[in-house]
Amino acid sequence: MVTLASHLDACPDAAIWGSSKTENLGVEKIIVNVISNSNIRYVLVCGTESRGHLAGHSLLAIHANGIDEQGRITGSQGAIPFIENISGTAVERFQQQVTVLNRIGLNDPEEIRRIVEDYRDKGEAYPEEPMLVCAPKKRQTSFAVPTSGDVIISGEFVMDSKAGIIYTAESL
């Protein structure tokens, strides 16, 4: 279940529950989490749409139309509807595995719970193994000389958590 920009209490009967406010990373995270569980066959998109980003509209568009060669979500009107961290294969798996239920604008917790109850036991598990997507983290290069370590690892080593670099304590 995707609650978009709304803050709604979690529904214990939903296999997965969370908000999404962006049409790129938010959509990517939904896809990666859904395809990692072959038992998820329905995704309820509800709550208030995020202005400008249109995460809900983009999720509907990627499910219906996929992405082009540049990773743009075909048919999305979001501000930056580009998928950069998952493959077209992962998008296709999402399209095949789930049915997306468009209830954008629905904020009534009781109606949402009813929909979850109606769909939680429908359908068989997707007939393929879960798909795991691992994207390498993009690392920012730091040219600054550290002046302090904000994480003490031991009496001998400290780490600058912003740069992600470990130093000997005596070098600072």
From Swiss-Prot:
Keyword Transferase recorded: yes
EC number: 2.1.1.-
Gene Ontology MF term list: methyltransferase activity
Disulfide bridge map: none
Keywords of this entry: Methyltransferase, Transferase
Pfam families listed in its UniProt record: MtrA
One biological process term in Gene Ontology: methylation
Entry keyword Oxidoreductase: no
Subunit structure as annotated in this protein's UniProt entry: May be part of a complex composed of 3 subunits; MtxA, MtxH and MtxX.
Family membership: Belongs to the MtrA family.
Record's protein name: Putative methyltransferase Mtx subunit A
Origin species: Methanosarcina mazei (strain ATCC BAA-159 / DSM 3647 / Goe1 / Go1 / JCM 11833 / OCM 88) (Methanosarcina frisia)
Taxonomic lineage from the root: Archaea, Methanobacteriati, Methanobacteriota, Stenosarchaea group, Methanomicrobia
Gene that produces this protein: mtxA
